[in-house]
């Protein structure tokens, strides 16, 4: 069974150290959660079959707990914990002894059994610099001055109005002045923790999507879906949160007016790739970070999910930062180095960060922006429109990636030159 190295995707900088390209800050070591698993059921099962399967699991688990073999494992297990249903994909998490896991792997209703994983956040530090990313999004990929705050960002004034961006992350400070009351608390999967953002990552990502100053879609609504806290998470919480998002979008009739942002990445983990794919088939668009390993994104989740919009990071002069993943599964490139946005610590706090965590929300914001001004009835239509607007062949060292830079479709762009 495959171990997972998984984390949020911002990189630290020392204040004032702007010239060197950064090395990626790797997330902490990823460990299997002892005795805890994600079970994926085969497609086509009826509700009755799923109910019968769960009864069977409970019976087998109880019997094994009573046996010497289960007791000898030294792991307390609690059986089925949570069920996830995304389109026609059914999964559940659970705490099981080794004998029950063996029985599950042989069950005719079970597609796969994967160990749950600890998921670690990358640490970041603050740097007060840069607003180049927004100007780049409306400049057809023309190089922009890194330190200038005088670059125009041109956009349609609908600016994401009526669209909902769901941010699966560390939470959002919904009271930050950048959100102007357009940010709401959605779901908090972390037990015994308040629905706040003590780490800063989720607030930062949301600011790039929809902040009044730093956002691509300045009138979009953002929904906080908390699956991480200040330390780590597991797929038990990530799948719960993603399942909630898909249900909320569906129940609220927002499929063609909603986008999910996942600024997270780790070693390939098929159950979550499957979940993202099923959301696409259900009519929901997901934008994901390519990852910060400086390697081919095909080995990362959720970047390898075939119908997610996978985003690599580009610098202001159209080069690929050394940290950004690449490859044939990277659909598009967007600003991802020295990007300023909202931060933790106060309702007007800001920070400048780098990583594909910053690139992904630029494209999620672009999706929200386009949804507000055009009739894009499906994720396929959204992806086609986003890619159709891109500017080709600009990124240096794109490796074998599709060489397409994000662009919002506005033709005019001006520089205000200082006197």
UniProtKB/Swiss-Prot annotation:
Propeptide: 17-122
Gene: SUB2
Signal peptide, first to last residue: 1-16
Molecular functions per Gene Ontology: serine-type endopeptidase activity
Residues with attached carbohydrate: 248, 261, 348, 388
Keyword line: Glycoprotein, Hydrolase, Protease, Secreted, Serine protease, Signal, Virulence, Zymogen
Active site: 169, 201, 357
Organism expressing this protein natively: Trichophyton verrucosum
Domain Peptidase S8 intervals: 131-419
Physiological role: Secreted subtilisin-like serine protease with keratinolytic activity that contributes to pathogenicity.
Protein name according to UniProt: Subtilisin-like protease 2
EC number(s) stated in the UniProt entry for this protein: 3.4.21.-
Main location: secreted
InterPro entries: PCSK9_ProteinaseK-like, Peptidase_S8/S53_dom, Peptidase_S8/S53_dom_sf, Peptidase_S8_Asp-AS, Peptidase_S8_His-AS, Peptidase_S8_Ser-AS, Peptidase_S8_subtilisin-like, Peptidase_S8_subtilisin-rel
Biological processes, Gene Ontology terms: proteolysis
UniProt-listed SUPFAM superfamilies: Subtilisin-like
């Amino acid at each position: 069974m495959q171990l997972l190295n998984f984390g949020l995707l911002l990189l630290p900088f020392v204040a004032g150290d702007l010239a060197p390209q950064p090395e990626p800050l790797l997330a902490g070591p990823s460990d299997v959660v002892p005795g805890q698993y994600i079970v994926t059921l085969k497609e086509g099962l009826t509700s009755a079959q799923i109910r019968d399967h769960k009864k069977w699991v409970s019976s087998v688990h109880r019997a094994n707990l009573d046996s010497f073999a289960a007791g000898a494992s030294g792991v307390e297990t609690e059986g089925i914990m949570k069920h996830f249903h995304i389109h026609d994909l059914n999964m559940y998490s659970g705490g099981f002894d080794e004998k029950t896991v063996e029985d599950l792997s042989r069950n005719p209703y079970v597609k796969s059994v994967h160990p749950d994983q600890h998921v670690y956040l990358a640490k970041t530090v603050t740097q007060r610099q840069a607003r180049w990313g927004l100007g780049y999004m409306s400049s057809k990929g023309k190089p922009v001055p890194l330190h200038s705050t005088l670059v125009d960002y041109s956009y349609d004034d609908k600016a994401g109005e009526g669209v909902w961006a769901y941010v699966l992350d560390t939470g959002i400070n919904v009271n930050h002045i950048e959100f102007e009351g357009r940010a709401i608390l959605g779901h908090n999967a972390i037990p015994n923790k308040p629905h706040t953002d003590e780490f800063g990552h989720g607030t930062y990502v949301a600011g790039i999507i929809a902040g009044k100053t730093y956002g691509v879609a300045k009138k979009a609504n953002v929904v906080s879906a908390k699956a991480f806290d200040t330390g780590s998470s597991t797929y038990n919480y990530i799948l719960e949160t993603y399942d909630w998002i898909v249900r909320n979008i569906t129940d609220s009739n927002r499929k063609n007016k909603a986008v999910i942002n996942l600024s997270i990445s780790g070693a390939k983990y098929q159950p979550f790739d499957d979940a993202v794919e099923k959301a696409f088939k259900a009519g929901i668009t997901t934008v994901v970070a390519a990852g910060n390993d400086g390697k081919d994104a095909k080995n990362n989740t959720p970047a390898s999910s075939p119908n997610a919009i996978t985003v690599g990071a580009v610098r202001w002069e159209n080069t690929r930062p050394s940290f950004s993943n690449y490859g044939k599964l990277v659909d598009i490139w967007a600003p991802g180095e020295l990007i300023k946005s909202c931060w933790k610590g106060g309702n007007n706090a800001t920070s400048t960060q780098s990583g594909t965590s910053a690139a992904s929300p630029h494209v999620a914001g672009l999706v929200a922006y386009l949804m507000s001004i055009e009739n894009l009835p499906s994720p396929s239509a959204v992806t086609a429109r986003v890619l159709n607007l891109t500017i080709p062949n600009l990124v240096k060292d794109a490796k074998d990636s599709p060489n397409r830079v994000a662009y919002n479709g506005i033709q005019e762009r001006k520089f205000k030159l200082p006197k």
